[in-house]
């Protein structure tokens, strides 16, 4: 990953605000000020500065953990290409809607990607299109079998235990499921809930008033449903920020061989590690995949030589990410949303015009 000038790393206050938003994406300035021992004016000013230029975005998580513990079925792809053909292959992959994440390693000829697919299906990308491309020299695919840690669940480790406890949400109350079509988290949604989630997807910090204006629903109804979604743990937000801006310029992909009787414990240990932002049990020779952020190479070495000891890991392959070629949603300012016109209610009987 390219070096970042020291002055581009966010201040301690800003990094603490980023971490607070990871715990509660809709955190108010007043509550953040109380928990972090800052003035509300400072919090409002810094949050505006961070979000106005796209340094930080809070979105509805595109990959959330369904209630049945799923999120399995997606494919990890490891693609090696001819030198000089990397950008062409990356561009072709990035154009596909079923590939939300693409990373290019520092070797300059290797791509890691995630492809959404149906479990057990013979995805044409893997079985026909990529293998027939002359620029591709090798292709490995592994199916996600179990999720230990999602990126939306990762928290930047800069808050004190008491602050984390104050910001941690209460244990979700499942409550009754809404009748409707499958929602983004593997549960059903009704039209009201789906319209709110759609409006919040690019900017999860929209106020209830703004949501009411965009969706055409009464503000009291919006507030009530938001509270219900939060209580049920279904309003899953994710903070988008370049990890280099929070002092973590090193990202590593880890492909691990773990003895079967240690797989569950090793996966959970990785999920609990503050550096790890993704951990999955997979098919293939490397049956545990992880992704982690580090402040420097010394920290990565300490992780490999100390933190992985005793987990039943028999082999580790480490790849450094040189460039995040695609993220869904992308980093940057919130895209403009089309205006939603509120439907006019028909005049009731006996109501005059004008």
Where are the regions a protein language model picked out?
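A compositional/biophysical signature of low hydrophobicity enriched in polar/charged and small residues
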Residues: 1-354
């Amino acid at each position: 990953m390219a070096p970042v000038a020291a002055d581009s790393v966010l201040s301690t206050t800003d990094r603490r605000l980023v971490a607070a938003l990871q715990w509660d994406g809709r955190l108010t300035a007043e509550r953040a000020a109380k928990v972090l021992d800052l003035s509300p004016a400072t919090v409002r000013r810094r949050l505006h500065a961070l979000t106005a230029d796209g340094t930080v975005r809070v979105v509805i998580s595109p990959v959330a953990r369904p209630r049945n513990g799923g999120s399995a079925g997606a494919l990890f792809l490891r693609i090696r290409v001819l030198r000089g053909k990397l950008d062409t292959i990356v561009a072709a992959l990035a154009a596909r809607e079923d590939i939300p994440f693409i990373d290019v390693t520092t070797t300059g000829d290797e791509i890691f990607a995630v492809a959404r697919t149906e479990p057990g299906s013979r995805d044409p990308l893997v079985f026909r299109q990529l293998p027939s491309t002359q620029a591709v020299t090798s292709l490995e695919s592994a199916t996600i079998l179990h999720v230990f840690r999602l990126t939306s669940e990762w928290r930047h480790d800069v808050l004190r235990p008491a602050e984390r406890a104050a910001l941690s949400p209460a244990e979700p109350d499942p409550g009754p499921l809404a009748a409707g079509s499958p929602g983004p988290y593997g549960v059903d949604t009704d039209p009201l809930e789906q319209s709110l989630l759609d409006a919040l997807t690019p900017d999860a910090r929209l106020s209830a008033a703004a949501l009411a204006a965009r969706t055409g629903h009464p503000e009291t109804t919006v507030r009530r449903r938001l509270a219900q979604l939060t209580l049920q743990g279904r309003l899953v937000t994710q903070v988008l920020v370049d990890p280099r801006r929070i002092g973590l310029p090193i990202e590593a992909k880890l492909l691990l061989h773990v003895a079967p009787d240690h797989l569950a414990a090793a996966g959970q240990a990785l999920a609990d590690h503050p550096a790890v932002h993704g951990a999955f049990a997979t098919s293939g020779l490397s049956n545990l995949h992880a992704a982690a952020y580090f402040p420097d190479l010394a920290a990565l070495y300490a992780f490999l030589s100390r933190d992985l000891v005793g987990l039943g890991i028999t082999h580790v392959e480490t790849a450094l990410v040189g460039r995040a070629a695609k993220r869904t949603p992308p980093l940057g300012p919130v895209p403009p949303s089309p205006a939603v016109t509120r439907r006019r209610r028909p005049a009731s009987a006996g109501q005059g015009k004008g």
